[in-house]
Amino acid sequence: MSTLNVPKETMSRKDPEKFFTIVEKLGEGSYGSVYKAINISTGIVVAIKKVSVDNDLEDMEKEISFMKQCKSPYIVTYYASFRKENEVWIVMEHCGAGSVCDAMKITDKTLSEDQIAVVSRDVLQGLAYLHSVRKIHRDIKAGNILMNHKGESKLADFGVSGQLSDTMAKRQTVIGTPFWMAPEVIQEIGYDYKADIWSYGITCIEMAESKPPLFNVHPMRVIFMIPNPSRPPPKLTEPEKWSPEFNDFLAKCLTRKPELRPSAEELLKHPFITKAKSHSLLVPLIDEQDIIINEKGREVALGIEQRDEEEEDEDEDSEDSDDNRGTMVRAKPRSMQNSGGEDNDEEYDTGTMVITDNKNSYDTVVFNNDDEDSGTMKLKNTMPSNKKNFVPDYMNQFKKSDDDVTNVPLSDKYSSYSLEELKKMLAELEIEREKEVQKTLEKFSINRQALLAVIDEKKSK
């Protein structure tokens, strides 16, 4: 490929619009929106992530530094970065087929076992490279696996990635997406690259079933349930429908003790991977996705355009509202199906918690050690709403309302609504859920800090 015409310096102050023309919005990542763009002088297509400087600039610099150091065909390539007014533009390789998550969402399909094996071979190659240079991705999921039109996969979105230095053999901060997080990450007992292996095991289930295990469980309960040693490791909902090789591969990825969990290099030798077929197996899925995108446009196919309009309406409404959710970033909810997740929720010491939006309707959670940040929790995710006074039924149940409507069978209650009305009601329900999450987290953080203060005081006596 030709060389891009871009400044060599990091965080260049030159105007990026003199180098690139934005074509369309591709999606929304954990740290900002991503756009397809063309390098004006060469015609090369790239992806540009625009990140508001309201976010932590230090984190962005870490991400850029991380990407610049990575040189692998299985890792998205970094090209340049710009600082423009209140935004940072990160220019990177464009993977035309988008993420695995987007492909599933747009086509409303899951991946076959053979397709999962092909993706897994590429992902494990990428992880093997990262781990060999002492780096941890820390946010492996289908939304962070990008594909090109050949069906080749690459790891992306290093917003929460970390590097293992010689003086810090194991990370002590907890950063990742709760449904995909390894037990040792949540327990804050220190972790290494094996955490990525667990996350990829969860990602394989996500690719097979469209959602990760426990997706229907409250996020706060999830972080209590995953580390519970009495809970069996996650597995496919119907393992008998999948090959013994795939089930065994998952079991190895999802080994609870990290010291017994195989490395990426070891997993590349597993029969499930060694028997993986050609990248061309992914092409039919990509072609089907492209047909839908050509008919509707990518933003409509992903629901981005509708969400942006709803956000504008919400912003207008919020000007006159006392309920200031200025720190929250709205995301479109995905439809939820009950998978019968267990309800055991023993509590664990989870530290101070930060939830940031990853735009896949699943929150990215950051726990900090007490010595790093004992401040209040931040919640940067909620859903769009057009009805401020809407109260979902589960809230009425909490209030023990005597309203007869709570006794109406749910299927009868909602059957008369149109599809669009049901979608809006689901979005509003998600808003109430996020409000309850925030209240719970605030209470949890306050109580924990109070307990720690008393413990420290007693220790000093």
Swiss-Prot record:
Gene3D superfamilies: p53-like tetramerisation domain, Transferase(Phosphotransferase) domain 1. Residues 411-458 form the SARAH domain. The keyword ATP-binding applies. The active site is at D139 (proton acceptor). Its cofactor is Mn(2+). It comes from the Eukaryota. Residues 303-349, 369-388 are annotated as: Disordered. Residues 307-322 have a biased composition (Acidic residues). ATP binds at L26, G27, E28, G29, S30, Y31, G32, S33, V34, K49. It catalyses: L-seryl-[protein] + ATP = O-phospho-L-seryl-[protein] + ADP + H(+); L-threonyl-[protein] + ATP = O-phospho-L-threonyl-[protein] + ADP + H(+). Belongs to the protein kinase superfamily. STE Ser/Thr protein kinase family. STE20 subfamily. Regulates both cAMP signaling during early development and the stress response. Functions as an activator of adenylylcyclase. This is Serine/threonine-protein kinase 4 homolog A. The lineage of its organism: Eukaryota, Amoebozoa, Evosea, Eumycetozoa, Dictyostelia. The gene is krsA.
